[in-house]
Amino acid sequence: LFPRIREITDAFGGRLQVSVEEHPSGALVVLERPDITGRPRILLDGYGVDVLSGYIMSARLAVPHELPDEHIDGMFATRFRLGLDPCAVLALHQASGPALDIPAPFWDRLYAELCLVAAHARELGRRAEARVH
């Protein structure tokens, strides 16, 4: 069952991979743009997935207006930013590499996919806890 990998595409050939991988803490969600040179990628734990899901919805409601950045800390510290010029894009920044840009055409499908992967990640976390006890 794991790793679980799904690919979202847009009408222009853009690609966004969303995967769930086992991790000692339970699970990680990996977002990657294989269509972009350097294949930018972001690793998120459950907290990061929850914040990203909320930020996607907030961005949808905010466009064409600005939205304050969101920051999460911890092992997978990330900054979420809404860019508006020249088009709406979510930029995810981690210290370990280049920003991962997610254009607006991906947002709805990514939100739906994050709902699914969050459930898988919680289950992997539950299994990891059961192994420890």
Put a short name on every predicted segment.
Residues 1-133:
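Positively charged, low-complexity terminal tracts
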